[in-house]
Amino acid sequence: MDVQYVLADLQTGPESQSSQSSIHFHDMAPFYVVSIERQHGLSGLVSIVPCSTTPTIHYDEKDKKAYQKAWSRGRRFAALFENLLNGGKMATKTSCSLQQTPYLQLRDEALIVGSPLGTPTRTREGISSFHNMEFNFPGAKPVVSSQMLHITCPGLRSEESLFDKNGGALYDSVTVLTGMCLFTRKILDESVADGFLDTRKLLDMQLTLYEVERIAGLSSAIADIAALVLSRYDGKCHKPVNIILDLPTWHYYQSVEDQLQHRGYKPCEVMDWIEAITLRSQQLAGLLKSAVLHELDRRGVSSSQRLYDIQISPGSALVDDAFRETLKYENLPCLDNILEALSGSEDGSWQQFYSLLPERDRPQSIKDLSYLFYIFEVVRPAVLAGIQSGNQQTPTQSADMDSTVSHRQQQPASSRSYTSKQNQMPRPLVISVDDPSERKLYSKAHSFFLRLPKNPIYPADPTLVQVYTTRRVFVDGNRKGERLYRNDPSPVMPELSNGKLYGDGGDAGYSKYARELQQMDFIAKLYGAECAANIQRWSKEVGLC
């Protein structure tokens, strides 16, 4: 699923020139042509073009400083990420090439994306730069995968890598996690909009454009990062590498919670509706897992080697069971019952997480809990690391540790240490891979990470690296910064736009497709025909075709 620099523009407004939406494709590669709005029609999107040794930034004059700042900050964090995954400065591109070792190279090309000034999206998300990060996997069947990524890692120091100055593993465990939504916002709303819960709309729904695009984009990025981490540890040490796929189930209950009392939905109806959502979640999780396994195998990491573990929404099972148990007895779920069920988690992660929440951040409704739970899934690996280390502190040790932590956080990770191994806090590394629209969630998770070293019971010193994939699909020229999830026309497919099929860098064979775009045509255009064929095959295996 190597990234081709093809972007899509979904036209839902008057410019579509019909009641049906249409779609344009724009080839941004190989970046040697200045890509500015008058050429591709996407507001707020600019490119950085390699020009001798200094990249040239093509920007909107009104946003000159903002775009330059976004590029500079993004480039700096991308370089830190490159150093982290390459195992430090000792692992240069040249040495890795000579040894046939996988490596990451930060290239010059970049996309800077920002919605127009004055739009809610611009206020919420600002401007981000996505840098071309080239993952190289030599071998009998070499793979070179280019990802346009935005990195945020405020807790990462310039000298930090996977190893300390003595060559020992710096982190006790590595977790790569991601998540995605189900269906589209429109489909979920329509399933509850006609005075009854229309479960059939959910059960009979084909894959949406949003779903297939997320699976294609996330799986290759996850595999690139996980495979590179595994290659660094190979032969040196064995450290747990976990991949977590977090997909919602009960979280969507808040979509109907406010309407239950007004419309008189029966608990059995609600249960059927949630079961339909759970089925979709399981199917998509299976599809995403198959895609990740395939991409890891392409990069030389076979599942038979048992070097990693893939988990699906590991913290949600207790809540799913609590919902089923309540609805089975014709009752509606309530927050107190769910919190009580969570308090019985065997690994203790929820109890520790909840105990560190300030009173103002504790949920007051199931809707609050559903959002908080996404944050919990990000924080959970770090909380578990503290619990599993078994280094429970006495109150006196905790007080002494506060001053030690304050000093440690000013030091590079390579020099961080305690006077004795026994008192050393566990250091889990968590790498999230997600859409930029979820940035607020990970910012809240990061603020929680900062509290864990001072946890009076099970302290940990975690690092969170946030990796965001670039948007591949824009809506209405990005004039309002809207997202595909809220504007996906599925199950009605958009029309291919006239005059945009050829001469835009697309495949010559694309003319064989029908005028109405299908999901796999859409993926073939963005990610390649092989990727589309694989997703179609895996979809059948999980019952989605």
Swiss-Prot record:
Single annotated GO MF: ligase activity
Q: What is catalyzed by this enzyme?
A: L-glutamyl-tRNA(Glu) + L-arginyl-tRNA(Arg) = cyclo(L-arginyl-L-glutamyl) + tRNA(Glu) + tRNA(Arg) + 2 H(+)
Q: Does the keyword NAD apply?
A: no
Q: What is this protein called?
A: Arginine-containing cyclodipeptide synthase ateA
Would you identify the family this protein belongs to, as annotated? Belongs to the arginine-containing cyclodipeptide synthase family.
Keyword Ligase on entry: yes
Q: Which organism is it from?
A: Aspergillus terreus
Biased composition (Polar residues) is annotated at 390-425
